[in-house]
Amino acid sequence: MALTVEEKAQIVNEYKQAEGDTGSPEVQVALLTANINKLQDHFKANGKDHHSRRGLIRMVNQRRKLLDYLKGKDTTRYSTLIGRLGLRR
């Protein structure tokens, strides 16, 4: 269910702000979004897995906090990120 090393590296390379950047809000939100999407697929087959659902809710909350932080710091970066990730339809 977790992202592979290759998937993480690809996401980091796609969303990084500078070389070696793994902690920027953009990278963190992109990684959380990928994990959330994988867990949503998991729940289609395993609807009664409530322990993993708790982890999913925690990830969604963490992503929300990071997006709120980014929106307060730089709205253009926020708008670009949600557009690239396909959030906020």
UniProtKB/Swiss-Prot annotation:
Gene Ontology molecular function terms on file: rRNA binding; structural constituent of ribosome
SUPFAM superfamilies cross-referenced by the UniProt entry: S15/NS1 RNA-binding domain (SSF47060)
Record carries keyword Glycoprotein: no
Keywords: Ribonucleoprotein, Ribosomal protein, RNA-binding, rRNA-binding
Any GO CC annotation of this UniProt entry: cytosolic small ribosomal subunit
Any GO BP: translation
Functional description taken from the UniProt entry: One of the primary rRNA binding proteins, it binds directly to 16S rRNA where it helps nucleate assembly of the platform of the 30S subunit by binding and bridging several RNA helices of the 16S rRNA. Forms an intersubunit bridge (bridge B4) with the 23S rRNA of the 50S subunit in the ribosome.
UniProt similarity note: Belongs to the universal ribosomal protein uS15 family.
Subunit structure, interactors included: Part of the 30S ribosomal subunit. Forms a bridge to the 50S subunit in the 70S ribosome, contacting the 23S rRNA.
HAMAP family (UniProt xref): Ribosomal_uS15_B
Protein name: Small ribosomal subunit protein uS15
Organism: Azotobacter vinelandii (strain DJ / ATCC BAA-1303)
